[in-house]
Amino acid sequence: SKEQFCNDVYCNENEIEEMIKGGMVIGGHTHSHRVLSRLSSKEQFVELQRSADYLKNRYSINEPIFSFPYGHIDTYNNKTLEHLHELNYHSAFNTVRGATCIIKSGKYELQRYDTVDLYPH
């Protein structure tokens, strides 16, 4: 079932708390995993705010990092980046392959390598 699949694949709140206690950093990914560039500015703000509020209220994370849903540069826009700043997000990662460099990309468009990118083919 879909519920069983989600229980098997995704972390529950207890597992997240254990990860935080172990020193891992937990960040936001929006509230409902929608493509942000398809939303109005207000809808984007609400998505990002609900995610930030959840992290703050549930895990006391006041300056979360963010990972864009779907990650491609066409799935967010300049309004998204402005809202991340307004809501005090620490930084944000997209799925553009590359080493993280704040000077090159700015703190709200950090590149990264996905684990799939590093797997030998």
What would you call each of these model-derived segments?
Residues S1-G22, V35, N57:
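Active-site beta->alpha N-cap acidic-glycine motif
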Residues V25-H33:
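Histidine-centered catalytic micro-motifs
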